[in-house]
From Swiss-Prot:
Its EC number is 4.3.2.10. It is found in: Cytoplasm. The active site is at residues 11, 130. The gene is hisF. One of its GO terms (molecular function) is lyase activity. This is Imidazole glycerol phosphate synthase subunit HisF.
Length: 258
């Protein structure tokens, strides 16, 4: 059995790490490189960096920090934000990133997933899915351009359909960003995760809602996700990664102990 992964998420805007609630009202958390180093030392299995402004305002991620991160950590990391071409991806991977993640550009041009997978291998192609639960219809819908409140829009894709589509096109991993839960720290959306798990046959990462150690346990035990991504609880030092992993191990979760 593969070990479950604990993955801190660092949202990057203008060279600094920020965090919002339900993708809005972002506050500055700190500088990128020291935070990355701290999380690696605490025992994170992987890091994910999202340039949350890149896709919405047309820029590719400012790459100067990618190589600096690669120099100070020895765990895999993934970079997302405005990657619209093979050239964009090649540059980021050449700076030392292990994976690249695409989200809004994949919705704009789904063939990008296949072209990236063919060029670089499925193992380093992650597709992020920003999913919103519509209480009126009882359905989960994929959102696009969530880095900019004024441009965020609901797409025609229902989440379960898009999950299956990106797998067919070559996604090697899926990060499910559950927008309703983002930053509110009351638990992952287990109902949605279970539905997605049934149709997702590549590694599935839960994102949005972690507030306690028990929330991580529930995601692993009840929804069988491969990794759990979180931001607020790590940034605000509500949960220590080493202590979280020790707790999960006592609960029978297969986890890498540092």
């Amino acid at each position: 059995m593969l070990a479950k992964r604990i993955i801190p998420c660092l949202d990057v805007r203008d060279g600094q790490v920020v965090k919002g609630v339900q993708f809005r009202n972002h506050e500055i958390i700190g500088d990128i490189v020291p935070l990355a180093k701290r999380y690696a030392e605490e025992g994170a299995d992987e890091l994910v960096f999202y340039d949350i402004t890149a896709s919405s305002d047309g820029r590719v991620v400012d790459k100067s920090w990618v190589s600096r991160v690669a120099e100070v950590i020895d765990i895999p990391f993934c970079v997302a934000g405005g990657i619209k071409s093979l050239e964009d991806a090649a540059k980021i991977l050449s700076f030392g990133a292990d994976k690249i993640s695409i989200n809004s550009p994949a919705l704009a041009d789904p063939t990008l997933i296949t072209r990236l997978a063919d060029r670089f291998g499925v193992q380093c192609i992650v597709v992020g899915i920003d999913t919103w639960y519509d209480a009126e219809t009882g359905k989960y819908h994929v959102n696009q351009y969530t880095g900019d409140e004024s441009r965020t829009r609901v797409t025609q894709w229902e989440t379960l359909d898009w999950v299956q589509e990106v797998q067919k096109r070559g996604a090697g991993e899926i990060v499910l960003n559950m927008m309703n839960q983002d930053g509110v720290r009351n638990g992952y959306d287990l109902k949605q995760l279970k539905k997605v798990r049934e149709v997702c046959h590549v590694p599935l990462i839960a994102s949005g809602g972690a507030g306690t150690m028990e929330h991580f346990l529930e995601a692993f035990r009840d929804a069988d996700v491969d990794g759990a991504l979180a931001a607020s609880v790590f940034h605000k030092q509500i949960i220590n990664i080493g202590e979280l992993k020790a707790y999960l191990a006592t609960q029978g979760v297969e986890i890498r102990i540092c």
